[in-house]
Amino acid sequence: MSYQCPLCHQSLLLARQQWRCENNHQFDCAKEGYVNLMPVQHKKSKEPGDSPEMMQSRRAFLDSGHYQPLQQRVSELLEKFLPEKAESLLDIGCGEGYYTAVVEAQLNKRRNLKIYGLDVAKIAVRYGARRYPAVSFCVASSHRLPFADKSLAGVLRIYAPCKAEELARVVKPQGIVLTVTPGPRHLYQIKELIYQNIHLHPLKAEPLAGFELITDESLSYPMKLDGVQAYHLLQMTPFAWRATEDVKKELADRALFECETDFILRVYQRLN
């Protein structure tokens, strides 16, 4: 399996560190090993994706290990529900590859899967490609996936947006999509610092046309963070845009900040 040209949708072939289609559209491999499949005309800004500051905070927080239970559960669900003869898996919105790399390492203990990581942020993909060479990284839009119809056995989507039509297009029959979304009480204690009134609403499962929901579970646990970790956690979320400087300073000065996680994990299977 190879990439698909984002301009004409023909297959891309790799030769001399360059991906090229039969219409002679060319995409160079970066020295770090990733390929940029985001044409200028598809960009909505000069540097799409998260800011460098948000990515630095995310990297620092994730490296502290507080989201390892989610990392592990994602790997377990993929191992359980991926078809036995699966050959490829795509992580949409992979960022720097925190989840992608562990999925690759865990699944390939007994499989031989090609693992792809896709993100719109070039700086995140560059870092991931440098740190995790076993993963094939690309810069691309999650709304225009550079993969052929029915070419992927599975897709991992943690918080990332993606059109249901695109998922139905690229996932093989009997293939799966694993989504992770924040539950009602996710980071509730951070919300308390920012919002006067918090309303908890139960989340209904997202309908994905062409897929059947086969498992729906939550993962919740408490975290004990120091001030630096709490600050990085805030800065890696959209809550940072609403937080005042006083709130940020209060978090950073904490000796201990207790906060809860609440993740919703759902597995969908592609119908024939």
Name these PLM-found stretches.
Residues 96-110:
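Conserved SAM-binding loop of SAM-dependent methyltransferases across substrates and taxa
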Residues 85-95:
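Conserved class I S-adenosyl-L-methionine
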Residues 44, 49-73, 77:
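Class I SAM-dependent methyltransferase Rossmann-like catalytic core
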